[in-house]
Every structure is written in C-alpha cells, then in structure tokens.
C-alpha cells in the first residue's frame, strides 16, 4: 500500500488525518534537528506514522492507538513498514525506557493535558513535543454547539492556557491548518 491509497481510505471512512501543512512543518522540524525517533499518540489508521516513516532521518516510530478496531486496521495497513511499532493501549498506561526525539500528540482532545504530562518523560533532552488541532476550527462556523462540543472547546482552551503557562518550556502556537503547538524544554 502507498501513502496516497491510505489517505483515500481514511477520507472515505471519515478518519481524521494530519493536514499537509502540519505534516510539512513536522518534517522540517525533523530535518532541521536531525531527529530519528517519534512517539505518536493517536494512530487511527496509521496515515501520519506512514507519512513520517518516509522521512529519511526517521529510523523508529512508536505509535499508540487505544481503539482496538483502528489498531487492527493500522497493523494491516502498516505491516510492511518495519520502522513502525504499533501499540494498542491507552497512552496513560504506556511505559518504556526509550526516549524519543519528537512526540506527536494527536489523541483525544479532552485529555491533552494528561497525555502531555505522561509523555513528557519519554522526551529526549533536546526533543520537541508537537500537539495537533489546538484550535478545533470545525466548531467555529456552527451556530449552535452541543453541550459536549462546548465542553470540548473549553477543555482545549484550558489546555492551551495551561501549556503556555508551563514553567521550563518554550511554547509556540502556530496558526496553520487547525493549529499546532510546538513545545521545547528550556
């Protein structure tokens, strides 16, 4: 399977995928820093892990997916890419002695703070954490939001405020696609 085929499958099945500008930004970060390893939170069907694996610097990707159905499909779609290791687990239970150059958080938006707190210990000293979809623009043009949508928007806004106020971190919010946050330890 090639990347375009997987992208088509994701779109046809309404599976969210990393947007092109965000992917380009992350590839620039990888290239500029010579990063070789990625921890991804939120595999879905594996589109972003597949895309990252095409970067020649990347030697190892561990991607975590909580949903068993998505995990099974990702295993099938990515089975030929040896540098990708897929884990079926809620990220808060993930443990490893391995450290990663880049951590890409694209999991449940209502649990971003918990995911960030848990995953930061897996980051190399000069590593970067990237959080995707900080703006949730899909809700911007809706006249009425459900109570759950309002709660989700509030949680994401709280996470953004929490993240920017973190001691010991340089945090940059980039207004591309649906918003990307770049976090690097000071």
Placement of each model-derived feature along the sequence:
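A short alpha-helical cap/connector motif
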Residues: 1-102, 109-130, 134-186
């Amino acid at each position: 399977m090639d990347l375009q085929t997987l992208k088509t499958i994701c779109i046809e099945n309404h599976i969210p995928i990393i947007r092109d500008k965000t992917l380009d930004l992350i590839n620039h970060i990888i290239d500029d820093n010579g990063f070789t390893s990625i921890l991804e939170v939120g595999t879905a069907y594996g589109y972003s892990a597949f895309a990252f694996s095409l970067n020649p610097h990347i030697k190892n990707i561990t991607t975590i997916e909580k949903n068993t159905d998505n995990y099974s499909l990702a295993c099938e779609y990515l089975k030929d890419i040896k540098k990708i290791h897929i884990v079926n687990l809620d990220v808060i239970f993930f443990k490893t002695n391995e450290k990663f150059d880049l951590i890409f958080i694209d999991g449940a938006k209502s649990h971003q703070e918990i995911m960030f707190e848990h995953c930061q210990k897996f980051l190399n000293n000069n590593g970067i954490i990237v959080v995707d979809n900080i703006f949730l623009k899909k809700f911007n043009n809706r006249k009425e939001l459900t109570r759950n949508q309002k709660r989700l928007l509030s949680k994401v806004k709280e996470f953004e405020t929490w993240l920017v106020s973190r001691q010991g971190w340089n945090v940059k919010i980039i207004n591309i696609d649906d918003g990307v946050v770049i976090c690097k330890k000071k």
